[in-house]
Amino acid sequence: HCGFHRPELKYRVTELGQMTPTSSTFSIDGHQFKIGVGGLYNIYNALAAYSLGRFLGVSPEQIQNAFQADEHVFGRQEIINVDGKEVTLVLVKNPVGLNQVIDMVLTDPEPFSFGFLLNANYADGIDTSWIWDGNFEKLNLPRIAHFFTGGERYKDISTRLRMAGIEQIQEEPDLTKVIDAIKKMPTKHVYLLSSYTAMLQLRKELAERKYIQGGMN
């Protein structure tokens, strides 16, 4: 025995409540919290913020107020209205985060469309093989009404989806045309996952068409 062991936890999630694509309820040390984003990974983030706040002497009530006042930042489950289509834009960049986002998306019980924009520039990572560790097989469900891919490496992500058993895929390599494609989606809600530079290109187009205030806002 070397004497090393896991330290005793000072703060822990004691209960998981309702989890949807747009909110999560949970308890930390018996204190109930709600955050305005979905995904188990965001509960981990909230636990980290809570732990630091309590270490600095911030009360649970103040932390809850901060959680409620928190705003979405670009690419982090922000919701953009595109002529009546509710587009949830999520940045993805590695398989662990991707699988967390897939699990988050699947908490939506309603029909939706699913898109993935993939580039392979240095800011994205020039090796796209990480997408093969994504659990795309989970998405082969009747309630996902439409699949589409885009970006410079759209063929890579389309191939991955087809290997997951998804045959009907709309492909749009030109990111300037993605917005028009979204308008024609068969569902009101569209989940759009994107690598970093593809997201910036899309946001530039969204800003030019006045759907958002600016490319980085």
What annotation goes with each model-predicted range?
Residues N45, A49, F147, L192:
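Residue-level signal for inorganic ion chemistry
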Residues L192-N217:
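Glycine/aspartate-rich loop-and-adjacent alpha/beta segment that forms the canonical ThDP
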Residues V37-A48, V73-G75:
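Short glycine/threonine-rich catalytic loop with a Thr-x-Gly-x-Asp
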Residues Q32-L40, E86-T88:
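A short glycine/serine-rich beta->alpha loop
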Residues H1-Q32:
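Extended acidic/charged loop-beta regions that coordinate divalent cations
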Residues V73, L91-E171, Y211-M216:
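Active-site beta-alpha connecting loops in nucleotide-dependent enzymes
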Residues F4, L16-P21, G53-V92:
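Gly/charged, well-structured mid-domain segments that form the phosphate/adenylate-handling core
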Residues A46-L56, V101:
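Buried hydrophobic packing segments
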